[in-house]
């Protein structure tokens, strides 16, 4: 994407290293976003995606917060489907396995100084994966983090950008050293209200009600 031409030159190429200028805006000011989704192979051998348009819409919201151009929903879904079609032999069929798909977008302009970049790339990589946790689908131990915070009101907590995850690594390392698999983050102001768990959804069943 460039200011002059918009999105252009879509293509599928073999995976390999990419070249970046040392002054690339992304390396200094973290103007990048990403998504995470999976393709599954059914018992009948059919390959299925789960609501890819929702991932596309979430990326649009993330991009807006970071002053990055919108990548249209139809182009996003088309790109994902095209890549999965090419790599369909890599979609595993064993229980608890899938093809992990990582769409991401980043600024490519080479310039120092905080500003909205004038050029971006949207890319997708993928690979077969097993269960995310060593415990599989069994219960995992979660540490309630009451010192560090992941998101604050008015911040970027609702976006999928690298800075959010870089800021959460210290809490994750702390949890793992104590024998936990993940972190339950509390609110940034009072440190007592449940916000989220780092890599999964969370819900509570209280007196028969699901929250």
Per-range role (PLM):
Residues 1-83, 112-211:
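Helix-start/capping segments and mature chain N-termini
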Residues 72-83, 92-109:
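Short, glycine/charge-rich beta-strand/loop segments that flank catalytic centers
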């Amino acid at each position: 994407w460039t200011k002059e031409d918009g999105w252009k030159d879509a293509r599928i190429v073999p995976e390999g290293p990419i070249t970046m200028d040392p002054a690339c805006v992304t390396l200094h000011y973290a103007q990048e976003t990403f998504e995470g989704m999976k393709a599954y192979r059914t018992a009948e051998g059919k390959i299925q995606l789960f609501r890819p348009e929702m991932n596309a819409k979430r990326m649009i919201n993330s991009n807006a917060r970071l002053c990055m151009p919108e990548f249209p929903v139809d182009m996003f879904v088309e790109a994902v489907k095209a890549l999965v079609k090419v790599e369909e032999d890599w979609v595993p069929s064993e229980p608890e396995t899938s093809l992990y798909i990582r769409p991401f977008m980043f600024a490519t302009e080479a310039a120092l100084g905080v500003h909205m970049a004038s050029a971006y790339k949207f890319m997708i990589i993928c690979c077969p994966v097993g269960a995310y946790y060593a415990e599989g689908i069994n219960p995992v131990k979660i540490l309630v983090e009451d010192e560090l915070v992941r998101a604050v009101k008015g911040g970027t907590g609702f976006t999928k950008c690298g800075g959010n995850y870089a800021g959460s690594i210290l809490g994750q390392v702390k949890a793992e050293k104590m024998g936990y698999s993940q972190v339950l983050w509390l609110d940034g102001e009072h440190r007592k209200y449940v916000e989220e768990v780092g890599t999964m959804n969370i819900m509570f069943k209280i007196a028969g009600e699901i929250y």
